[in-house]
Amino acid sequence: MASKSLVVLSACIIIGSAVPVEKLPVLKSQPAEVLFRESQPTVLECIIEGQEEGVKYTWTKDGKDFKWTEHNAAQRTNEGSLVFLSPQPSDEGHYQCFAQTAAGVASSRVISFKRTYLVAEPAKTHEKTPVEGKPFQLDCVIPNAYPKPEIFWKKSLSGADPNADSANLGRRVTAGPDGNLYFTTVEKEDVSDIYKYVCVAKSPAHDGEVRLVEYIIKEVTKDTSGYKGELVPQYLSKDIVAKVGSVTMIYCMYGGKPQGFPDYFKDGKDVNGDAGGRITRHNRTSGKRLLIKETLLEDQGTYTCEESNGVGKPVKHSLKVTVVSAPKYVKSPEKVIIAKQGQDVTIPCQVTGLPAPKVTWTHNAQPLSGGKTTVTESGLIIKGLQKGDKGYYGCRSTNEHGDEYVETLVQVN
């Protein structure tokens, strides 16, 4: 029988180890992005889990050594975590933490440290006098912000408690992804001296809501154009690139009277769906939006909405949905592998993504190349494990839509 065997050892398997797995020094996982508000204290975490003394922590920023003592920052006691006391735009960058332990040098994923902001002028109130019975829209410019804010509309009673505001605007009224509010038709019941239509933004840059613009519909005028209620386009989604796992919304918004109700097709197949389904037009928009709650690769295709209200000609709109995927692990890799000297060991790191991710490996924070290691689609194989092979093995996978990083501590008995 051969003296070597190929084994993949789970973190729960311990072969002759005197140290419990949960006490071995591994870095706590970090997020891919940390946001900060200018001048508000913010923490970049770097913590060794397990029982380990004398850990030496260092950081890089944008690939260069970062000396926190030369910046307005502090390091938490017994941790590598950085506390930016009053972060400024100049502190933005890509940070990586390194922890030197008795087992080797552990490294974090690269963390994007970005300022969150939203630039908006004080909200102004505008009075509108639309034409009765015709499609209509109220404009709301999405402000310069990071990340992109959530925009929504509500109906607000002048002088009343903001908590009494209503987000129920009625079946004829729908907010578009461009920030604007669309009326299938505007009617006399929309007129009010005391109610305002208010466009609001939510952002991690602010506590609470930020009012962007307010409108009062003072009155409606009679139509003299001869419009009969035929369907006219208001907001129609263009081609979409959607990420696996994300929410995708396809808008098919036509104005007209009576109000139509779109039917949706994917590659010619009905995808209207049922209320509560993963794909459904039943999502409180009177069918004006097809909702894909969790996008899958199979959702790629050509989508068409068709609508008729019995006045004028039926309408149709088509667009393409292209589905992409950031790197994702097929199975969560182990944080710790403990193996005997002389064994062949596989460190699992199987990744999917579209386009196919590029996978790179490090050993104790240094690029790994050739030698006794072999990279496969399922992970990294170490031939004839020796004491010098112990340490932290990092697997980083990247494509244009994201990146993932996982690190495995290999202990040799």
From Swiss-Prot:
- Residue ranges of the Ig-like C2-type domain? 25-112, 122-211, 233-322, 327-413
Question: Which GO biological-process labels does this protein carry?
Answer: homophilic cell adhesion via plasma membrane adhesion molecules; proteolysis
Query: What are the alphabetically sorted keywords of the record?
Result: Blood coagulation cascade activating toxin, Disulfide bond, Glycoprotein, Hemostasis impairing toxin, Hydrolase, Immunoglobulin domain, Protease, Repeat, Secreted, Serine protease, Signal, Toxin
Tell me the compartments it is located in: Secreted
Question: Could you tell me in which tissues this protein is expressed?
Answer: Expressed in larval bristles.
Q: Per its UniProt entry, what is the enzyme's top EC class, as one word?
A: hydrolase
So which domain of life are we looking at? Eukaryota
Enzyme Commission designation: 3.4.21.-
Give the molecular function GO annotations: serine-type peptidase activity; toxin activity
Location (main, coarse): secreted
Instruction: Output the Gene Ontology cellular-component terms.
Output: extracellular region; plasma membrane
| Residues with glycosylation annotation | N283
The stretch of residues making up the signal peptide is 1-18
Transmembrane residue ranges: none
Cystine pairs annotated here are C46-C97, C140-C199, C252-C305, C349-C395
Give the record's family classification: Belongs to the hemolin family.
Q: What is this protein called?
A: Hemolin
